[in-house]
Amino acid sequence: MARIKPPFAYFGSKGRFYKEIKEIFEENYRENFVDLFAGSMEIPLNFKNEFGELKVLANVKDEKIECLLKEDALKVYKKGLEYIKHDLEVNARDLYTDEKTKFDEENKIFKNIFSECCPCCGKRLKNKKNHEIFNDNEKMVLKILMAFGGCSTSLSNSFYSPQKLQNLESYIKALKSIKITNNLFDENWEFENSFIFLGPPYIQKINKEEEQFIGYNYASDKGIHWSVKDDNRLIEFIKRNQNKNNVFLVFGSVNNNLSRLLKNNFECEFIVKEYKRVTFGKLAEKAEYFCLIK
C-alpha cells in the first residue's frame, strides 16, 4: 500500500520511523490511535490508511498546519502556480537546473506576494501587509507548499512536480478520514482503549532561562515555552490514563529530561534508534528513543 507523504518539509516528522512505530502498534493493537503532538500527521494518516477500522485522533497545534487545514490548500497551490506563471509541464528541479533565469523570474514574483521587492535584483525592500489576491492564511499555505516548509518567502527548488501535486491531493483526501483537533496539551485529558503516541515539541535550550525550552513552531513561528514543568505534566497525563487499557509510546531525544522522568516513574521499555541526518549541508549522527509503557 502506497504511503501518504506530507507534500511539504516538516521539522521533527516521525515518518522516517514509520516501520518501527507500526510494528510496535501491531504488537499492542488498540481500537483507538491517538497522536497528541501530531505535527504533519504522517503517522496517524497512514495508520488510518492501513487499518481502515481504526479510530484515529490527531491533535495539531501548529499555526502553519492549521492554516493548511482552514483553506482549500489544493486550490491555493494551483492559484499560486498560476500567479507565478509556472508551466505545469516543467518540474521545478529541472527549471532550477536548466533554466535558472526563468526560475529566478518566478521567484521574484513569488517573493512579491509577501514583500515589496526590487524589480532588478529581487531584494526585499519592505514587508507587504496586504496582497491583492492572497489573504494571510493563503500566504502561509503558499509558504508551506512552495517555499522551505513555511520558513521562507523564496521558492524552493522542489516547489512543483506532478508527483508533489499528486501527494497533495492524496494528503488532503486522507485528512478527511480522521478526527483532527487543535488544542494545547492538557494533562487532564482522559482516554481509554487507546494507543497513545506522545512526541512533545522538539526542544532547544536557551541561555537566559536554564530550565526553559522552546518547542519548535509549536504554536507560532517563535514557538512557546515548553519547560521541565511541562515534562512533569506529561508524566501526570500518563499516570491519569493508566489502568484504562491504554498503551503509551513516547518519543524523544536520548538522555533528555523526559527520558529520566519516564525511567523514574514507570516500568518501561526504551528502544533507541540511531540515524544520520543532513542539516544545512552538514552530516550529523542522531539518536532518539521510543519508550513503551503498558
Question: Whereabouts are the PLM-identified features?
Answer:
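S-adenosyl-L-methionine
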Residues: M1-V34, E42-N46, G281
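Conserved proline-anchored active-site loop of SAM-dependent methyltransferases
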Residues: F33-F47, A58-D62, L145, N193-E210
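Short, polar loop motifs at secondary-structure junctions
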Residues: A38-M41, K164-L168, S253-N257
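Class I S-adenosyl-L-methionine-dependent methyltransferase module
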Residues: L54-K176, E210
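Conserved SAM/SAH-binding loop
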Residues: N182-E187
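SAM-dependent methyltransferase catalytic-core segment centered on the flexible catalytic loop
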Residues: F195, I203-L249
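Conserved Class I SAM-dependent methyltransferase catalytic core
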Residues: D231-V278
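Core SAM-dependent methyltransferase catalytic element
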Residues: T279-K294
